[in-house]
Amino acid sequence: KPKISMNILLLGSGGRECALAWKMSQSKKLSKLFIGPGNGGTAAYGTNVALKPTDFAAVSEFVVANAIDMVVVGNEDPLVAGIYDYFKSVDALKDVLVVGPSKAGAMLEGSKDFAKEFMLRHGIPTARHLSVNSENIAAGEAFLESLKAPYVLKADGLAAGKGVLILDSLDEAKSELRLMLDG
């Protein structure tokens, strides 16, 4: 039988978490809302708590101590680190609902290279790409030369939505590629 009211822990500290906290706070099914670590905006909708979302031991202690029914993972870092899998592997946490994918599923967000290979493997339309590292910069530059502007460079891994450069100049794209890989 579903619970009539729930204690929820929302993990994260950005604007996304503020929007989620605002909407969750309107639910009649919400008993208590905690946001870890939260921000100034989230404090208006629940209780901010000093939690680092990737510190699974501290998060799990808080969940048990506060009878949390659901954990909503707002940002990508704990998902890529495997928080869903962690909760499902600990007996005291198995029944806690975790909103977010497993570590394997989070790779679609956590690695642009993995996501591109996944799309190709499954016939999902996507733009042409080449994965470049410091050992094949020349191949990366040659690939850029085969394209027309705009040139799109993406860093692999999490970048908080800021890992993409869109450039109109081939020379600038080559320069930025070298900067991304050589520092």
What kind of region is each of these model predictions?
Residues G110-F143:
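Short, glycine-/small-residue-rich phosphate/pyrophosphate-handling segment
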Residues A43-Y45, M107-D113:
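Short, charged, surface-exposed secondary-structure boundary motifs
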Residues K52-D55, S111, E135-N136, S169:
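Acidic/polar helix N-cap motif
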Residues M70, P125-R128, S146-V152, D168-G183:
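Conserved ATP-binding module of the ATP-grasp superfamily
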Residues G12, V132, V164-S169:
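Short beta-strand-to-turn element immediately C-terminal to the catalytic PLP-Schiff-base lysine
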Residues M119, L147-L167:
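ATP-grasp fold ATP-binding core
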Residues F62, A142-F143, E176:
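CheY-like receiver
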Residues I4-P101:
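ATP-binding N-terminal substructure of ATP-dependent carboxylate-amine bond-forming enzymes
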